[in-house]
């Protein structure tokens, strides 16, 4: 019996829409990362992108537990000497609510070209509107 290996041309990718309202950041991010990788499919192959497209709406209404809203820090660098900037969860969710979920999911995906390709299949929007109605995404309850 031969081991099955998925071929990139034969992979079927579906579109799903996830409502992040009232969801916990980490629990939502792990399920999204799992679906972006394709681990929920029987034909999962580690070196082939077998995952689905995920559209996340209401990213501004996501929450974290405990004191993490004030204590969790997000760092970025401007590229100049001494240019390390930090922002806590509360400020980042006000400034760029999409980035919070993007950063969380990106850290759960493989590092390298395959992980970057998987990350591109996630579309995050702060509000309820998204421009992917033509793809007819199915509602995914997480």
Swiss-Prot record:
Gene3D superfamilies: Ribosomal protein L13. GO terms for biological process: negative regulation of translation; translation. GO terms for cellular component: cytosolic large ribosomal subunit. InterPro entries: Ribosomal_uL13, Ribosomal_uL13_bac-type, Ribosomal_uL13_CS, Ribosomal_uL13_sf. It comes from the Bacteria. Disulfide bonds: none annotated. Keywords: Ribonucleoprotein, Ribosomal protein. Signal peptide: none annotated. This protein is one of the early assembly proteins of the 50S ribosomal subunit, although it is not seen to bind rRNA by itself. It is important during the early stages of 50S assembly. This is Large ribosomal subunit protein uL13. It comes from Marinomonas sp. (strain MWYL1). The lineage of its organism: Bacteria, Pseudomonadati, Pseudomonadota, Gammaproteobacteria, Oceanospirillales. The gene is rplM.
């Amino acid at each position: 019996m031969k081991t099955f290996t998925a071929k990139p041309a034969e992979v079927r990718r579906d579109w799903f829409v996830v409502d992040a309202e009232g969801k916990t950041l980490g629990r939502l991010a792990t399920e999204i990362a799992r679906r972006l990788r394709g681990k929920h499919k029987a034909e999962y192959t580690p070196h082939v992108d077998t995952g689905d497209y995920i559209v996340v709406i209401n990213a501004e209404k996501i929450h974290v537990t405990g004191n993490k809203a004030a204590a969790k820090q997000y760092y970025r660098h401007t590229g100049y000497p001494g240019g390390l900037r930090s922002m806590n969860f509360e400020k980042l969710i006000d400034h760029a609510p999409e980035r919070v979920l993007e950063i969380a999911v990106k850290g759960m995906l493989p590092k390298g070209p395959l992980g970057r390709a998987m990350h591109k299949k996630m579309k995050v929007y702060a509000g309820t509107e998204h421009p992917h109605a033509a793809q007819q995404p199915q509602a995914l309850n997480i």
